Amino acid sequence: MFKLNHELIPKSLNLYTVSVMSRSKEKLIEAAITYLNSEGADKMSVNKLVDLANVGYGTFYNHFASIEEIQIEALNKTVRDMLINFKLDVRNETDHVYVLYLALLRGINLLANTPSIHWLLKDVQMVIQVFKEVSQPNMESNYLNAVKAKQIKNTEIEDLINFKNSRHYMQWAAIGAVEQVVNGEFTEKEAFEKLAKNVTVVDIPDKQRDAVIARILKETHPWEIKDNDGKQIPSNPN
């Protein structure tokens, strides 16, 4: 049986190549997302996925080495789709610092509202890795744009290294915020505000940071409504 050598073909090519083989892979990933959202990860099996995707058993192993691998691909696609929509939402925004903070709220919103959140919280390292691979390049681009636009003062392009290093800590802290939302301790915006004021997203004066946060808290975003079945989450009155 022919087996695809994943080492020879980039992941991006696997995802977007228009062919029968890539379509089968897409169907399997969609099936995995559907299953994870409805059943969680514990009972996922190859048999169940190929039935949902309506593909042959061997097709699974042409694309994935294990169930764990397709779980990562499923989360990868979910985050990538979110990022595409997020970039469209802010395409006309000129305040790049605002975009960096808004992305933090969007990440909390995405995870807190996904039906898969409980199994995702069991594998936080996987979540961190996916966000690092998918969203980090976009956040670095926004950071550089903010520096070039002088929206981050007294900063040079070389400080991007420090930003990269701090993002890892921020991602772990964001997972803690998601857990607080899931446990009912805070609303998404309350968790976001607490996190954004206590962990450095970017090195800017508190006054500038607080103004950006206040703007975000006052706004209502399309994905807030969509992800909460049409119910808006009230901003933190403080």
Language-model features: locations:
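Amphipathic alpha-helical segments used for helix-helix packing
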Residues: L105-V130, L144, E179
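Hydrophobic alpha-helical connector segments
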Residues: E73, K87-T114
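Short, hydrophobic secondary-structure boundary micro-motifs
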Residues: S45, I117-K122, T155-E156, L160, ...
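Short hydrophobic/aromatic patch on the recognition helix
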Residues: A53-F64
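An amphipathic alpha-helix adjacent to DNA-recognition modules
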Residues: S22-E30, D42-K43, N62-K87, L105
